[in-house]
Amino acid sequence: MRLVQLSRHSIAFPSPEGALREPNGLLALGGDLSPTRLLMAYQRGIFPWFSPGDPILWWSPDPRAVLWPESLHISRSMKRFHKRSPYRVTMNYAFGQVIEGCASDREEGTWITRGVVEAYHRLHELGHAHSIEVWRKDELVGGMYGVAQGTLFCGESMFSRMENASKTALLVFCDEFIRHGGKLIDCQVLNDHTASLGACEIPRRDYLNYLNQMRLGRLPNNFWVPRCLFSPQE
């Protein structure tokens, strides 16, 4: 296994099975963040993640963290909070604000550089990247964004500026996703936060099999149309 240098003149990726074991999942470096290359990466179970100033690094870890939306863990306190939630939740109302929020709300720094913001904004304009927004009145207080692959959603990042805002985004999205035929959410790498929400690890080969099936599936044509998903009770 060796790290592959990508060419700017080809969008081809090596097989994810050739990714390094240490660091886990590192597959290639270089290339660019053009929409065509990004979409090719997601279709093959590969995603970019790198530090500012470093070359673009491409990953496909084994195992892979996923969340079956029907297995989302909702604590009793979160259930009580959601019943009296002050938040309004929308889809695709403010993609730019959400990704900017994810970039700025990281005390330890972020991989979401200006170039990354612009790249995913292009994907959004092409109808492939989507956002969930959480509002307190007219203030954006949390949200999440990711890339759609048929009935699979590749979650990229979330942020929260008020209590339970990002959890509300995920809860409302999972409910809507399930009701319209969504099957699986890719969480990439398991951490304490995603594990607490019900995410689990599966072998990479299983994830790739699910991806190959689900990316050919279809949600309703109007699923990603900008709309309100949840409003607080009066």
Curated annotation (Swiss-Prot):
Reactions it catalyzes: N-terminal L-lysyl-[protein] + L-leucyl-tRNA(Leu) = N-terminal L-leucyl-L-lysyl-[protein] + tRNA(Leu) + H(+); N-terminal L-arginyl-[protein] + L-leucyl-tRNA(Leu) = N-terminal L-leucyl-L-arginyl-[protein] + tRNA(Leu) + H(+); L-phenylalanyl-tRNA(Phe) + an N-terminal L-alpha-aminoacyl-[protein] = an N-terminal L-phenylalanyl-L-alpha-aminoacyl-[protein] + tRNA(Phe)
Keyword Cell inner membrane recorded: no
EC number: 2.3.2.6
A GO CC term assigned to this protein in UniProt: cytoplasm
InterPro entries, per database record: Acyl_CoA_acyltransferase (IPR016181), Leu/Phe-tRNA_Trfase (IPR004616), Leu/Phe-tRNA_Trfase_C (IPR042203), Leu/Phe-tRNA_Trfase_N (IPR042221)
Pfam families: Leu_Phe_trans
GO molecular function: leucyl-tRNA--protein transferase activity
Cell location: Cytoplasm
Family: Belongs to the L/F-transferase family.
Role, per record: Functions in the N-end rule pathway of protein degradation where it conjugates Leu, Phe and, less efficiently, Met from aminoacyl-tRNAs to the N-termini of proteins containing an N-terminal arginine or lysine.
HAMAP family referenced in this protein's UniProt entry, alphabetically: Leu_Phe_trans
Name of the protein in its database record: Leucyl/phenylalanyl-tRNA--protein transferase
Lineage of the species this protein comes from: Bacteria, Pseudomonadati, Pseudomonadota, Gammaproteobacteria, Enterobacterales
